[in-house]
Regions:
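Helix-to-loop junctions at the C-terminal end of transmembrane segments
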Residues: 48-61, 139-140
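A membrane-interface helix-boundary motif in multi-pass transporters
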Residues: 134-156
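Short hydrophobic/small-residue motifs within alpha-helical transmembrane segments
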Residues: 40-47, 125-127
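Helical-face signature of the major facilitator-like transporter fold
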Residues: 84-96
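Extracytoplasmic gate region of multi-pass secondary transporters
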Residues: 1-39
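Intracellular juxtamembrane helix-capping segments at the cytosolic ends
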Residues: 96-114
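Structural signature of the two symmetry-related core transmembrane helices
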Residues: 63-78
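Multi-pass alpha-helical transporter architecture, strongest
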Residues: 150-176
């Protein structure tokens, strides 16, 4: 949703988004606009990523999470600097594989407590709503969405640090 609001802001400032050179999309006489397309492609990328992530099962979750968070961080920074929202749309593809990696790393070695930990972990999805609200507040404070994506970069870097350091399991951490 925040990608759409940023697209509206760019259009109003005289920098409309285009898709194959068109700044509007008319289907069945209805102007769907680029804004709807951005969201559709983000979630479409998410779906495609989930579908192809099974092919990466031979690659460790730690490696997958490291690579995807690094790429997502780079894309978010490029998007902020260039004001090109297509880079943010591409992050949807990367985010799709992150969820399963984080989940796998979080429950590894929990033994009989895996189901309880899974429930706690699933409830943490609420954080996505909280960070969206924080980003909206930052957009109000800054008067623009452009630099609010720093919050996304910070979150990506936190996930990167989890992949590199926080997901390590020491023998004494394993619960029997």
């Amino acid at each position: 949703a925040n990608i759409n609001l940023h697209a509206f802001e760019l259009a109003e400032s005289g920098h409309p988004m285009t898709f194959f050179g068109k700044s509007d999309i008319i289907i069945g006489g209805m102007d769907l606009g680029i804004h709807a397309l951005l969201s559709t492609l983000y979630w479409g990328g998410f779906l495609v990523g989930r579908a192809i992530s099974s092919f990466f099962s031979k690659i460790s979750a730690k490696t997958q999470l490291t690579v995807t968070t690094l790429l997502a961080t780079i894309l978010a920074i490029i998007s902020m600097l260039t004001q090109n929202l297509w880079y943010l749309v591409a992050i949807g593809l990367l985010h799709s594989t992150m969820w399963s990696c984080i989940f796998s790393l979080a429950i590894k070695g929990l033994g009989k407590y895996t189901s309880k930990a899974s429930g706690v972990f699933i409830s943490a999805v609420f954080g996505g709503a909280v960070f969206t609200l924080i980003q909206g507040g930052l957009a109000d404070i800054f008067g623009s969405w452009r630099w609010t994506w720093c919050l996304t970069v910070i979150c990506e870097l936190l996930m990167l640090s989890y992949a590199l350091f926080g997901s390590r399991i020491r023998p004494k951490d394993i619960i029997q």
